């Protein structure tokens, strides 16, 4: 039995994403260090970093999801709107709506701009689609 690729979505056009160089390096390091424990989401995060347009760390990225951003997004399947803060794993706390970048939702949101949507597959092989409604950095 072959394993389905976590980020397998050949028919879907992925939106362009923008990430600061220093964050991309830290996120690549995180994906590498977590590859054994969380192989699917680590691979997804690494793929997102590979395709990201990198900008200088002092760039003005208003409206772009980055680490520490407060994000309002809509689950396109359910219509549910959520407000979260995107954080590193050690800062995650779902009761405070602090979502780790090392979750499928967190990895999907990083680098997106307001109005962009992304489709991805969860570890349970469910397809999800999220649209970013607002970002404050």
Please report, for each region that a protein language model flagged, where it lies by residue:
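Contiguous hydrophobic segments
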Residues: 3-11, 90-94, 133-137
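Generic serine detector
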Residues: 2, 8, 32-33, 53, ...
């Amino acid at each position: 039995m072959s394993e389905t690729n976590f980020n397998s979505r050949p028919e879907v056009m992925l939106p362009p994403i923008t990430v600061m160089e220093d964050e991309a390096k830290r996120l690549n390091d995180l994906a590498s260090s977590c590859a054994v424990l969380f192989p699917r989401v680590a691979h997804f995060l690494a793929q997102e970093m590979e395709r990201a347009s990198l900008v200088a760390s002092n760039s003005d990225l208003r409206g772009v999801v980055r680490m520490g951003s407060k994000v309002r997004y809509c689950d396109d399947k359910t219509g549910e709107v959520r407000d979260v803060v995107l954080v590193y794993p050690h800062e995650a706390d779902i009761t405070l709506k602090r979502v780790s970048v090392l979750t499928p939702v967190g990895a999907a949101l990083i680098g997106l701009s307001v109005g962009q949507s992304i489709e991805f597959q969860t570890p349970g092989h469910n397809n999800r689609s999220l649209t970013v409604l607002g970002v404050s950095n």
